[in-house]
Amino acid sequence: MDDLKTRVITASVVAPFVVLCFVSYESLIGLVSAILILAGYELITLEMKERDARFFYVILLALYPVLYGLVFEEPTQPLSILFITGVVFSLITDKDPSQVFKTVAAFSIALIYVTFFLSFFLPIYRDFGAANALLVLTSTWVFDSFAYFTGLKFGRTRISPRYSPRKSLEGVIGGFLGVVIYTFLYRLVVNDLLSVNVISFRTFLPFAATVAIMDTFGDIFESALKRHYGVKDSGKTLPGHGGMLDRIDGLLFVAPVSYIVFKILEGVVR
């Protein structure tokens, strides 16, 4: 109960600030970069022990949304530049050839899994508007909450006993239904009352399914990473939630797939 209370307090403090960052494209870029500094540092720290080197790689990770959002039009351009920079830095600083591979592997995973995936919020915002970008974010919060309490009450069928023993099919179904209800209410307020375009009713189920499935596998994947490194949490950034990576693990899979779903249903979204 104390842990749940801590989680609620932390969320109550952090959530309003995060939502406010969606008021402009530039503030969203700043938010993504700030999150990448924390989550990227946590992930890279699991593999790299050299403190100065870790900071350099984290700076590269945080630069991606700035370069992609403000300088380059294609996402692969800054991605390639940052990857090559990281490889060259490793070749210069790592004395042991075997360490070069470990360093580049860790940096590559962080660059794709954390940086590239989270930065999909930028094209979602740019192509489909702030309301839909915020919907993607808040829907993961709703899914996590509904899945947690439903699983706590009715959870019987374990999805991944090896990596995430407490995650149940019943919890996922509860989270899915929660997202459907939330998306309906979100559209009712944002679209019908505020006259801001949000995904249409026919898109609710594909979107809710995307959130439920991708959030679940995002969480399982991060659990597998933590088991590999023998840690319970990725960090201690957010009291009650663990590290920043623990908080956004599902979101990292949800954001890119949601963008693809929106692209496929672009006529519906617009």
UniProtKB/Swiss-Prot annotation:
Pfam families: CTP_transf_1. It catalyses: a 1,2-diacyl-sn-glycero-3-phosphate + CTP + H(+) = a CDP-1,2-diacyl-sn-glycerol + diphosphate. Its main location: membrane. Keywords: Cell membrane, Lipid biosynthesis, Lipid metabolism, Membrane, Nucleotidyltransferase, Phospholipid biosynthesis, Phospholipid metabolism, Transferase, Transmembrane, Transmembrane helix. InterPro entries: PC_trans. GO terms for biological process: CDP-diacylglycerol biosynthetic process. GO terms for molecular function: phosphatidate cytidylyltransferase activity. The chain crosses the membrane at residues 17-37, 55-75, 81-101, 104-124, 129-149, 170-190, 193-213, 248-268. GO terms for cellular component: plasma membrane. Its EC number is 2.7.7.41. It is a multi-pass membrane protein. It is found in: Cell membrane. Pathway: Phospholipid metabolism; CDP-diacylglycerol biosynthesis; CDP-diacylglycerol from sn-glycerol 3-phosphate: step 3/3. Belongs to the CDS family. This is Phosphatidate cytidylyltransferase. It comes from Thermotoga maritima (strain ATCC 43589 / DSM 3109 / JCM 10099 / NBRC 100826 / MSB8). The lineage of its organism: Bacteria, Thermotogati, Thermotogota, Thermotogae, Thermotogales.
